[in-house]
Amino acid sequence: MSEITPEVVESHGLSSEEYDVILKALGREPNLVELGIFSVMWSEHCSYKSSRLHLKKLPTEAPWVICGPGENAGVIDIGDGHAAIFKMESHNHPSYIEPYQGAATGVGGILRDVFTMGARPVANANALRFGRPEHPKMKHLVQGVVAGIGGYGNCVGVPTVCGETNFHPAYDGNILVNAMTVGVADTDKIFYSAATGVGNPIVYVGSKTGRDGIHGATMASTDFEEDSDAKRPTVQVGDPFTEKLLIEACLELMATDAIVAIQDMGAAGLTSSSVEMATNGKTGIRLDMDKVPCREEGMTPYEMMLSESQERMLMVLKPGKEEMAAEIFKKWELDFAVIGEVTDTQRMVLEFGGEVVCDIPLGPLADEAPLYDRPTISLEEYKAWAKIAPITDAPDSADPGADLLKLMASPNLASRAWIAEQYDSQVGADTLQTGGDAGVVRVHGTKKALAISTDCTPRYCYADPYEGGKQAIAEAYRNLCAVGARPLAVTNCLNFANPQRPEIMTQLVEALRGMGDACRMLDFPIVSGNVSLYNESKATGGGSAILPTPAIGGVGIIDDYERMMTMGFKNAGDTIYLVGPEFWATPDPTRSHLGKSLWLDVVHGRDEGRTPPTDLVVERNAGKIIHELIDDGLVNAVHDVSDGGLAVALAEMALSGGTGADVEQNSEYTAAQWWFGEDQGRYVVTVPDTEALNEALSKGTENAETAQIGFRRIGTVGGDGLLGVSLADLREAHASFFREWMEV
C-alpha cells in the first residue's frame, strides 16, 4: 500500500482538517483504499456537505408523495394503482471534457436511478446551458452533447419529450448538462435501497468493472483547471444497448419476489452503492473483491471501488434466489456475481487476496460525514456586490415587428428543431406532445397522461437569487397548467459555483429559500434532486463562475389525455385573451417589467435591471383558473408568457398553429412594456365562445381566488402575420440560427 502523505490526501480532494476527522474515526491511519473511499463519499457530489443544511428546509411532503428525497428517485401516486418515479441529475464536468460520452452517460445514469425503483422509464427530458455560440469550443460541445443525449436515449428506447437549451457567456468554460427521466410503476411494486437481512447475499449485475470514471465524483466536486484534456480518463463510457438489456433483466427479476434491495452504481460506483444500501438498512456489508467482474487485468481494490463504469447494479437477494436470478441475467447476456453479504456490524469490510483491505465504520462515511454551514451575506449585500440596480432609462420599441424578428432569430429563442430532430420523441408510441409548454406521455393502457417540464431563468437568479428561485418553480407550474395538467411534484438540479465564496453560497441559500416558498404556496413538493457545485472554470477562454442555475423538473397529471391542451392557434376568429395579474386588465405601467428581459439584451445589448417579481398567490390562482377553463372546454389554445414577453408568446402560438393574429397594444403601456415585458404569472388563451367564457367568469367572481386575476381581450386569431410581420418571415427568422451556425 502507498504511504499516505499530505500530498496524497490533497490529491484526493480532502482538506487537512477532514483528514484529521478520518484519523479520529478510524483510530489509525487509513490505507489507500480507505482514503479513496472517504474521498469520494465526502465529495460534494456524494455528501452534499455544503448544501445539506439548507436542503432540509425544502417542502417534501404531500398526500400523493410516496417517497421523497433520500432514495434513488422521487415517487408520487398518480392514481389507479400507478406511481410516477422521476429525478434530475447533473453531468456537467464530464460533458465539458468529453461531450458525447459525458452527456450519454448522464442519460444512462438517470435512467438507472428510475428503473432501480421498479419503474419502466417512459420519458427523458433535459436542461442544457452553453456558452457564447461564437466561442471556439462551443459548436463542438453542443454537437457532442446533443448527439450523446440522442444516441443513448434513442438506443435504449426511451423518448426525449422536452428540454431547454440556453446560451450565456458565463458557461463558456463550464457547460451544464442536466438529464431527467420519468418512469411509471405499480404502487405496490416499488423497490428501495435498504440492505436488510443479515447473511443475505449481495449481488453484482450488469457490465464488468473497468478503469473508466475513477474519481469521477471527486472531479465533479472541484473547480475546473486548464488541463481538462488530462481528465478524460475520469469520464465514463456508456453502452446504451447494455443498458437496455439491464432494464429488461432487472424488471424481469423485479416481477419475482427475489429482491430485498437494489441500488445502481452511479457516482463513486461500488463504493457509494454499497455504503448507501448498508446505511439505509442500518446494517453492515462485507465484499469479496476477488469476485467483482473486471474487464481489465490486474485491477486493484482501490480501482474497483472507485470505478464509475456504467450499466452496473448492486442487489441484495433473498437467500436461495441466487440461481434463479443468475439465469435471468445469463439470458440477457449480463454479468451476475455474488460478491458479498449483509452483516450486522455497521461496518464496510472489503477482502482481497485473502486479506482485509478495508475496514471502516459506516457512520463517518454517510450520516456523520462533514457538514458545513458556509458563510453568506445578506440579499441586499449580494445585490450590491452583483451591481444590480433598477433601470431608470428604459428604452421603447420603435418597431415591435422588427424587434420580434431579432428575438426569434436570437440563440435563446430560436427554433430547437435541429436539436429535437436528433432525439427520438415517439419511441414507445405513447408520446402525445413535444415542443410545447410541456412534454406529455400517455400512461400506457390508461386515459391518464404525465406532463413534464424543465425550467430555470439563470439571468433572473443572478440578479435576485430569491426571486429567481421562486420564478423557476412558478414557470414549471405554469407550463404544466398550460397543457391541462395538475402539477404534482418537482425534481431539481442545483447548479452553482464555488460555495466557499460567500456570494456564491448566498446564491444557493436564497434560491433554495425562494424555491421553498414557491413550492409551499403552490402545493408542489420537491421529491428528488441533485446538487452540482464548483461549476467554475479556469479553462482558456472561459469565464469564471456560472450563473446560479437551479434547474427545475416539474411533473403533473392529466386525468384524460383527450383534454390535453396545446399552444398553437386553432381557428380563425377565436378571441385572444391575456390572463394574469389584474393590473394588466386595469393598466398600471409602473408594474410592467423590462429588467433582465431578453428584449433589452438582444435588441439593445443591455443585460441590466432587476428580476421581475413572482406573485405566488397570482400564480396559484391563475393556474387553477387555466386548469378549469381547459377542463370545461372553454379554450382552444393556451401558452404561458415567459422569455421575450407577450410578443414572443404570440409568435410561438402563431408558428405552432400555422396562422397569424390581429392583436392590439394597450396604449397605456409603451410598446416595449406591452410586447416585451417579462411580467410573471401570465398566459395567453384563445376562446371560441366569448359568451360562454363571460358566463363562467361571472360565476367565478364570487370566488375570492379569481379576484386577483384579470382577463383582457387583445385580439383575434387569423391572417398570415403578426405585428406587421408575415408568418413566412417569422418562420425563417426562427429557423435561421441553428441552421446557419451548424452549416458553417
Curated annotation (Swiss-Prot):
Top-level taxon of origin:
Bacteria
Compartment(s) where it occurs, according to its Swiss-Prot or TrEMBL record: Cytoplasm
Q: Which residues form the active site?
A: 45, 91
Catalytic reactions of this protein: N(2)-formyl-N(1)-(5-phospho-beta-D-ribosyl)glycinamide + L-glutamine + ATP + H2O = 2-formamido-N(1)-(5-O-phospho-beta-D-ribosyl)acetamidine + L-glutamate + ADP + phosphate + H(+)
Q: Which HAMAP family match?
A: PurL_2
Please give the family membership noted in the entry.
Belongs to the FGAMS family.
Name of the featured protein = Phosphoribosylformylglycinamidine synthase subunit PurL
Give the species. Erythrobacter litoralis (strain HTCC2594)
